[in-house]
Amino acid sequence: LVRLSYHAYTDWNARTPVDSASMLVEDFATDPAVDQDLIGSLAMRNGGLRSYVLQITARDLHRDAQSTLVMQVGRAGDGLRHYFLPVDPQNGVPLFDDHLPAGSQVRVRCEAFKGRTLFGARHAVEPGLPAPVFTSGGSPRPADTADSLFQVTVDPVEGTFDLDLRAPGIHHLQPEASNPEGYSLFVLTEAYPVVGTATDMLGPLRYITSRPEHERILGAPDMRKAIETFWLDAAGDRERAREAIRIYYARVENANRHFTSHAEGWRTDRGLVHIIFGTPNTIYRNERGETWIFGEENNLMNLTFTFVRQNGPYTNNDLVLQRDPMFKGAWYRNVESWRNGRVYQN
């Protein structure tokens, strides 16, 4: 038995909701061992607000556990994104994600554009990694120029169109050729968001390896075995190595699920900080971005990372770290801890 509730606020600083409601969901499973999605809807009264902050809470009444999501709906700069919804082409079930693995086939619902022709462009994303937290570099960005153009026609009755997403990159669709406002689908690696192959494991390992170490593993006849050897040498025994691998790549997958923008979550600034430093003790969010605090908030020894939201035509989940040379010592301490096989939570 789960209670779903929401509270809608005018902005991030508001304390009194303009609307709230809740509902109970009781799930009767014929086979408890099989995971299934429960999809429904709950009508909202937003008082005519075009933009508001929504807090959604799901509470398991049997287990006395809950999960909360806070998001801004109708953010300025979002443009036309909310008019599009990707669904499974086989059964029409919403995918609730604009990031899909390469090779996916997707159907997009956009009833507001029935019968219209949409102009599409594919943009590649830089293949590199974000710079360390203390340097002046940045994170991978989309290419300014599209490498291919295409058009799709929205079904005049169903209000849908289908796409075959074979090539990685940003597939951006816009109703007007001269206006970049539109909707983007992000095509990532085949295993996204999980770490499924040796190649998936090697990429994030670059954060804690030197260039020669990385190249040696890349050129090894058995890459997965070489990666396991790296962790075993770092940890000193198999049990510690297994635990370090589990936690390191769990953070990679967690970054993919929460921080993916135009690049996989582990290749973003927030993903970088999460993998190396762990989960912050405190997070502050507002329309400008996020602040992560590791340690006690009023302690002068804490670490505070500030991420600034970037407005662009493709995504509203692109936050860039304000890098600072003062982070250099903490960065190398954490990297060295990982290299010694110790799971570090700052």
Regions found by a protein language model. Give the residues of each.
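Intrinsically disordered, low-complexity terminal regions enriched in Ser/Thr/Pro/Gly
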Residues: 1-147, 155-157
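Solvent-exposed coil/turn segments that connect beta secondary-structure elements
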Residues: 9-13, 59-61, 297-299, 310-312, ...
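Structured core of small recognition/catalytic domains
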Residues: 119-181, 245, 256, 260
